[in-house]
Amino acid sequence: MSSSLASRRSSSSSAAKRPAAGEGGGKAAAGAAAAKKRVALGNITNVAAAANNAKFNSATWAAPVKKGSLASGRNVGTNRVSAVKSASTKPASAISRHESAPQKESVLPPKVLRIVPTAAPAPVTVPCSSFVSPMHSGDSVSVDETMSTCDSMKSPDFEYIDNGDSSSVLGSLQRRANENLRISEDRDVEETKWKKDAPSPMEIDQICDVDNNYEDPQLCATLASDIYMHLREAETRKHPSTDFMETLQKDVNPSMRAILIDWLVEVAEEYRLVPDTLYLTVNYIDRYLSGNEINRQRLQLLGVACMLIAAKYKEICAPQVEEFCYITDNTYFRDEVLEMEASVLNYLKFEMTAPTAKCFLRRFVRVAQVSDEDPALHLEFLANYVAELSLLEYNLLSYPPSLVAASAIFLAKFILQPAKHPWNSTLAHYTQYKSSELSDCVKALHRLFCVGPGSNLPAIREKYTQHKYKFVAKKPCPPSIPTEFFRDSTC
């Protein structure tokens, strides 16, 4: 009884508050309320894409290192290696700290809603002093209880609607909302077409500044260009001979060199050495072979001695001499390894700092990742895989390390996106190589990549088929590279 009485009082109060108006005024009031009241959106929704439940085996592959001398078959101590492996074995579910957790697929992009505004009716002017805020009114009015009536009446879109009138205007309210609120499918199509046809930042002939981070001292932004020029000059002085196999070595051939390097890759994986150690080891071997004839029985001794020097130069905790003796199944004694180490150091005149393809690759990967659409880790790991394959090929010594690194970036980008030109003005500026200058080296690396699965030197390929390297060695590669990619005018 009391509630119905309060409702009637509220209705009469609202009727008194609304100024007298004709039929046209009533329609205007109903129109204003129709524009103000929110109607639930019926079927306008976005459906999230189904989550990708595929799981990956995160167990990493450990390269089996064999014992024995190089001449007898490249063996590694089985007892010691198995003990090291069993002690360092981790659960199969462990994920490398470099790996990112699997992410769900992104949801569908929301549709663009175009709301067409309609002309608001003329505001109703009422003196503010004659109104009191309706704290618990039964009318159909959307107003904050903390807002004073005087403030609300200042809005030209505000007007009271009685309960009796709300039922009569509900149908027109629905129609008005459907007319005013509509989804523009044409705009979606136009925006999608514009984004597809618009050139990406890498396709526009502009040079991106990659040395603009002056806060990180490790990037050396102010000295980066000078450091690069110094490395380019040093690589010519500390590069091995390109024909020592034909002119100097009589008992060693390129195939034996490749077998030695393939074995050293396994040793580096076994002792978890950094990549720079492997690249420096190969550099020391080739520089020593460029001026010293050696027989095949001492080739493995040269390899472990050079890796010992490189590990001392690059590693925080380098393996001991005894460990390198053990890894050869004690084919060589400790004194022999130290004697060969001294011979290498004296011949190289203790100039152990040498630019390798890995030095340039770090710089080039960072340049390639600027505004690039390729996944950062996939590009980095794929370029590293291609660069390590180049260590096995004796004929690639005819190219400087900077050119090999630039060609590895070129080929990695081509494998990830075969339809897109892999070179651009930014890479050409920072590498100082045009695409035409990379043609021969890229084709040689492409052949190495394509014959990788059938190679009898599987260490590098098996290394990069691990989950922590994103299985980049398993990526398919087109059988040929379009010739127009090597034309400078297309960059």
Swiss-Prot record:
Query: What's an example Gene Ontology biological process for this entry?
Result: cell division
Q: Mind telling me which InterPro entries this protein's record contains?
A: Cyclin, Cyclin-like_dom, Cyclin-like_sf, Cyclin_A/B-like, Cyclin_C-dom, Cyclin_N, Cyclins_cyclin-box
Biased composition regions of type Low complexity, renumbered to the chain: 1-21
Question: In its keyword annotation, does this UniProt entry include Nucleus?
Answer: no
Question: Which family does the record assign?
Answer: Belongs to the cyclin family. Cyclin AB subfamily.
Annotated region (Disordered), positions in chain: 1-32, 69-106
Residue stretches spanning the membrane: none
* Any one GO CC term of the record: cyclin-dependent protein kinase holoenzyme complex
Entry's SMART domains?
CYCLIN, Cyclin_C
* Gene Ontology molecular-function annotations: cyclin-dependent protein serine/threonine kinase regulator activity
Keywords carried by this UniProt record? Cell cycle, Cell division, Cyclin
Its protein name is Cyclin-A1-3
Key word Cell cycle present in the record?
yes
Extract the SUPFAM superfamilies matched here: Cyclin-like (SSF47954)
Q: Where is the composition biased (Polar residues)?
A: 75-91
Q: Name one Pfam family in it.
A: Cyclin_N
